[in-house]
Amino acid sequence: MFDAFVVALTSVWADSGFAELTGGHVIMMLVGIVLLYLAIGKGFEPLLLSPIAFGCILANIPKNGFEEPGVMSVIMYGIHNEVFPPLIFLGVGAMTDFGPLLANPKTLLLGAAAQAGVFVALLGAMMMGFTVQEAAAIGIIGGADGPTSIYLAAKMAPQLLGAIAVAAYSYMSLVPLIQPPIMKLFTTEADRKIVMQQLRPVSHFEKVVFPIMCTIVISLLLPSVTALIGMLMLGNLFKEAGCLDRLSDTAQNALMNTVTIMLATGTGLTMSAESFLNYQTILIIILGLIAFIGGTAAGVIFGKLMCMVDGGQTNPLIGSAGVSAVPMAARVSQIVGQKANPANFLLMHAMGPNVAGVIGTAVAAGTMLAMIGPVAK
């Protein structure tokens, strides 16, 4: 009887995850716990980092059976086949007001300038030995746009998706810490004190026509990014039409929350010890930081140039909002500007380049897809 009991215990042990648990699995579970602490305890992008972190823990439990048909396989299908990022863009579009951009169209140039960091990191990654597709996927981290980073990584470097997504969302959450020193480095006290004129009112007609025309023009130029731009602008059309409130509300809330859970959890599920614990992950984190710093600096420098051209009417601080971390980057511009001049209110002005950055990052991704092409699956 004792022998039968021992055999039963041995069988239970052999079938358990403990039997195949490795040091790598333990390390990645600890990484997941640290990310949960940062998300819940410190408030770093909790809506995104929490499910990413929990997915990371789940991915590193041996014999989890996730490769079998079921809900987890559906989630992974949505990640690897670019289903979730466009749906996220639908929700983002429904929550985005392009009014500040339409009221001051030249801020579109600031959103474009902030994409310079993407291409700087791309070149740096290639110099470090990454393939051109991997380098492109790493570079897009500089746009501070998680869904676009995941979309491009799934197409060009699926093996790096977990590291790229974590880097992108981490730097998005660290915008208030990373950007202010760079903004102050490239501006003077006088620059930061500049008060900008109030934006003109934007008509309902302009707000309705913009997403339609933007979709047509960008999609014809870069067909590979039609899914992202099309869904972004469809969501915005829901918001601005005035007769689609139910669709707008669903896109902003129920759909956005559901897809966020699935996208973030699926991203965490890609963070297995085998794919994450290597020197490439460290390089990706470093290159992502370089890309983000480069994008912020390029936006501020272009803002300073714009200030010189228009006779001091543009506060260069709004250039840092050209990265597409909406609305965190615009808030940082407001905070830094108000510290220099308490009468300064830059938030709405900074929202122009901020929403332009969302478009700019998608365009940068489409440009790289058109020039380089996706990796063969």
What is each stretch, according to the model?
Residues 33, 101-122, 273-299, 350-354:
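Entry/N-cap segments of selected transmembrane alpha helices
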Residues 77, 81-82, 89-95, 110-120, ...:
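Alpha-helical membrane segments and immediately flanking helix-loop junctions
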Residues 167-243:
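Membrane-embedded hairpin module used as a gating/binding unit in multi-pass transport
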Residues 159-177, 287-295, 318-321:
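Alpha-helical transmembrane segments
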Residues 40-49, 67-75, 95-110, 244-252, ...:
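Interfacial helix-loop-helix linkers and transmembrane-helix boundary segments
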Residues 1-70:
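N-terminal alpha-helical transmembrane segments of multi-pass membrane transport
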Residues 35, 58, 78-102, 235-238, ...:
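Hydrophobic transmembrane alpha-helices of secondary-active transporters
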Residues 215-302:
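Transmembrane helical segments that form the transport core of multi-pass membrane transport proteins
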